[in-house]
Amino acid sequence: MPGLCVGGSPAATILKGKSIDLCKEGLSSQLRMATHATMRVPSVVTAVAMNTSLSEEIAHTTARLVVEEGLEWGPAKRRALREMGLPARTSLPDNDQVEEAVREYIQIFCADTQPRELRALRQLALVWMERMAPFRPHLGGAVWRGTATRLSDVYLQLFCDDPKSAEIALIDHHVDYDPRTVTGFHGEPVEALSIGSKSPELNEIIGVHLLIYDLDDLRGALKPDSKGRTRRGDLAAVRRLLEEKTDP
């Protein structure tokens, strides 16, 4: 009888016993490869689930820091990594994920106080938008999105023909301000004029930041985000928010 797995030659017949062993080894190797491939799929799924779970945990820690300490999202994400003992190069949750976590945190822990605080901040924003009306002010950030608390600052984006005109207006009205540089909505450095302004409703000094943009930037600023939401609102839009008590 010819040997298995080798062929029908006399040599194969002589090596019959060995050829059977080789066949067994070949089948065993194929089984091991198939088993490894089968086991690898759940491993990949598990890894993805773990990464998703970690990202959610980072987002919830970030949300707590944003709401309870008034941190901006970028610094809050980095602080969350340190608090969790994670490497600085750990993948961070995106802003949509953080915003969802912030809304959830507010709903659970701040539902009784946050709406009043948000309204007070929007009223303060409206005051400064009316004062800076010649410079086409738009409200952005947490106060516009509806996730602000009393620890949040107000961010107004001005679109000016002359980048120095808004600063001159503050000087003419004897308003103290601190010039600084912040990150703009395209990731570029933008000049900002920071003011401390008292909110009568909160009885606190709130940071109001006037970000100076060129008039040509206004068209791009009005484009909605990937979910169709408006990123910022003009004077009329903020007035409607205060009248309707709804979020954008």
Where are the predicted features?
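Ser/Thr/Pro/Gly-rich low-complexity, intrinsically disordered segments
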Residues: 1-2, 11, 20
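Cationic, low-complexity basic patches in intrinsically disordered or flexible, solvent-exposed regions
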Residues: 19, 31
